[in-house]
Curated annotation (Swiss-Prot):
GO terms for biological process: protein folding; tubulin complex assembly. Present with 1660 molecules/cell in log phase SD medium. It comes from Saccharomyces cerevisiae (strain ATCC 204508 / S288c). The gene is GIM4. Belongs to the prefoldin subunit beta family. Binds specifically to cytosolic chaperonin (c-CPN) and transfers target proteins to it. Binds to nascent polypeptide chain and promotes folding in an environment in which there are many competing pathways for nonnative proteins. Keywords: Chaperone, Coiled coil, Cytoplasm. The lineage of its organism: Eukaryota, Fungi, Dikarya, Ascomycota, Saccharomycotina. This is Prefoldin subunit 2. Residues 1-36, 72-92 form a coiled coil. Heterohexamer of two PFD-alpha type and four PFD-beta type subunits. It is found in: Cytoplasm. It holds the Pfam family Prefoldin_2.
């Protein structure tokens, strides 16, 4: 009986950790998307030939607005797509977790 409880506890903790990691990553990517939005808005008001710098693999690379803007917009779209997929995964995992709890008659007891 004790071993069975340990297995259930381990599985419960695993689900909770996965859900927490997904939520954290979604929030982090949301902040990245917001930063991209601010930079894109700022660059749209700038002259197309104006110099700007962007980080590529830890190095600052000089560019201009007209070159950097499409790259930033593409990255923002990719981030939005990733967030959407991660939200779907989060919802699916939460449903699996609830089903697992129901199937195994798991009740959370807090001290």
């Amino acid at each position: 009986m004790e071993q069975r409880n340990n297995v259930f506890q381990a599985k419960y903790n695993e689900y909770k950790q996965i859900l927490e990691e997904l939520q954290t990553k979604i929030i982090e990517l949301g902040h990245d998307k917001d930063e991209h939005t601010i930079v894109i808005k700022t660059l749209k008001d700038a002259e197309p030939t104006r110099k700007c710098y962007r980080m590529i693999g830890g190095a600052l690379v000089e560019s201009d607005v007209q070159t950097s803007l499409p790259i930033l917009e593409t990255k923002k779209e990719n981030i939005e797509g990733t967030i959407s997929k991660m939200k779907e995964t989060l919802i699916q995992t939460a449903k699996e977790f609830e089903k697992w709890k129901k199937d195994n008659k798991i009740q959370v007891v807090k001290n």
